[in-house]
Design a protein with these regions (language model features):
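A non-catalytic alpha/beta surface segment that caps or lines the substrate-entry region
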Residues: 73, 81-158
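Extracellular fibronectin type III
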Residues: 476-494
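Active-site-adjacent mobile loop/cap segments within catalytic or ligand-binding domains
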Residues: 90, 254-274, 321-397
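Conserved aromatic anchor
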Residues: 413-428
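Residue-level detector of structural "landmarks"
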Residues: 1-3
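Alpha-helical metal-binding/catalytic segments enriched in His/Glu/Asp
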Residues: 155, 169, 174-175, 180-228, ...
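Beta-strand-rich modules
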Residues: 459-479
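Metal-dependent peptidase/peptidase-like ectodomains
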Residues: 221-335, 340, 344
């Protein structure tokens, strides 16, 4: 309840700041009209025109916000369908990477074929809008002693304006018990990670009923429990194929609300993100040391974006941004994408229950162990899936993310930002840009200013030393991209 109140207070504060900002712009417009223009026009002409223009702009964006499709998209996510998919995945007995692949009813082979078929059924419902493919490689490793084919299932919903720009939601197909090499025992993996996989399938159902300027990818990744193999294989394939993946939302355990700590909470979620890019070069690190950006990698600003989507579109859900790649000493399938230079975050429940993770099914000292269906809260899984849906939709609806963002302002009273304005069909929905800034100790972007369709802007009397800065692109419908921090430190790529 406290988290919900805090979130509501934050939202109210943001609305108040936005309203004050709009009023300030209107007032500034009037004050600026006190002097007669060089052309000799009467000051009242300028007052009326500018005031009406500002008010009209405000009304347009207010109307766009009120009609934002993301509210309906969040409502369209079904807890019942997610439950059905989780039960189907659990019904395969085990989905261990080393399990049966020939059976139609048991093992990871049956599970991944069912997932591919489900994506095809979804595609049939949207007139063939999904390209369904498998991406695989044969691997060996500490937890894969014999050469084994690791197969991931991917569905691609192509964008209408900028099909090469992609955002991805992923879940994991595989499961495990106590022994990481046990590929035969029952391993239901209801929460870890049938919940995330079911979320990705449900996101495809909801979003495939609409068209977006950018491309959305839905992925079922294998081999996670054996060493994050599926993510690495898909990331390598993406780089070879020239996929321009701007963001990966990795969902790993999104259905548990009662933790090992005794806390039951269905109002919060965690988002993990790297603070600096794994692929940062020594030269880039030296530059960052003197210019800042230790908490402004593209992945971290992706986390901020997800946090903002929760505040705006998901009732009674507050995102806890964790300034860490993943849980302490642990890993998830966003990591291999980060290691390939692709921004990505992990979205998951706030309170984990370790009796329900990587455990043989048993009762010991009166304690029930095992990742069974009874440990999943389907409405909570629906809520986190809806968070993914609105985040994917927002990024796919936004214009191309700002590229080549640069900043200057050392020993000056003002700060100037520059970026490249794209051309061609991909930029058809680009309305302009929004400049953001915040105190260096603030976790979320605090102030912003819409600056129009320009390739640079100077914030007068905002000293570069005291703040951090970024730029977002804004569509003609008022939908903004994630904020891009200047330089290689914050770049989402070309």
């Amino acid at each position: 309840a406290k988290a919900g109140r805090d979130r509501n207070m934050r939202n109210s504060s943001r609305r108040a700041v936005t309203g004050f900002s709009l009023f300030a712009q209107w007032l500034q417009c009037i004050v600026g009209c006190e002097n007669k223009s060089k052309s000799g026009e009467h000051p009242m002409t300028r007052i009326t025109f500018r005031a009406l223009t500002t008010v009209a702009t405000c009304l347009v964006f207010s109307a766009a916000a009120a009609q934002d499709i993301r509210h309906q998209l969040a409502a369209d996510v079904s807890a019942g369908r997610i439950e059905s998919d989780i039960r189907t995945l659990v019904g395969f007995g085990t989905r261990h990477t080393l399990s049966e692949t020939e059976s139609d009813s048991r093992g990871i082979g049956a599970a991944r074929r069912w997932i591919a078929d489900e994506f095809r059924r979804i595609s049939a419902d949207c007139g063939g809008c999904l390209e369904v493919l498998t991406i695989s490689d044969t691997v060996t490793g500490r937890r894969i002693p014999e050469p084994t084919e690791v197969v991931s299932v991917v569905a691609i919903q192509r964008g209408t304006l900028d099909p090469e720009r992609m955002v991805m939601m992923s879940g994991d197909i595989d499961s495990r018990v106590s022994d990481a090499l046990n590929g035969t025992s029952d391993s239901p993996g209801a929460n870890d990670n049938a919940s995330g996989m079911a979320g990705a399938i449900e996101a495809a159902r909801v979003l495939s009923q609409h068209e977006f300027p950018g491309t959305i990818v839905y992925a079922g990744l294998s081999g996670e429990e054996q060493g994050l193999y599926g993510g690495r294989i898909v990331a390598e394939h993406a780089k070879r194929a020239g996929w321009r993946i701007k963001a990966v939302l990795n969902n790993d355990m999104i259905g548990n609300i009662t933790g090992i700590n005794g806390v039951t909470d269905n109002t919060t979620a965690r988002v993990f993100s790297e603070g600096t890019r794994y692929v940062e070069t020594e030269e880039e690190a030296r530059t960052r040391r003197f210019s800042g950006g230790e908490v402004d990698s593209p992945s971290r600003n992706l986390a901020r974006y997800v946090d903002r989507m929760a505040d705006e579109f998901i009732p009674n859900l507050d995102v806890m941004m964790i300034y860490r790649l993943d849980r302490f000493g642990r890993g998830g399938h966003h990591r291999p994408f980060n290691e390939a230079g692709i921004p990505g975050v992990r979205i998951m429940e706030t309170n984990e229950h370790y009796h329900r993770q990587h455990q043989d099914l048993r009762v010991e000292d009166g304690i029930e162990y095992g990742d069974v269906i009874e440990g999943v809260n389907f409405d909570y899984a629906r809520k986190l899936t809806a968070l993914n849906v609105v985040s994917l939709a927002g990024m796919a609806m936004a214009p191309p993310f700002p590229a080549n963002v640069e900043i200057e302002g050392a020993v000056r009273p003002s700060t100037t930002l520059r970026w490249t304005v794209p051309e061609g069909r991909a930029a058809d929905n680009l309305a302009g840009y929004r400049v953001y800034w915040r105190l260096t100790t603030e976790p979320q972007w605090t102030w912003s200013r819409d600056v129009g369709l320009v390739d640079s802007f100077t914030l007068e009397n905002i000293v570069i030393d005291n703040y951090l800065f970024g730029v977002a692109s804004v569509s003609k419908d008022g939908v903004a991209s994630p904020v891009v921090f200047p330089g290689p430190t914050g770049s989402f790529g070309d």
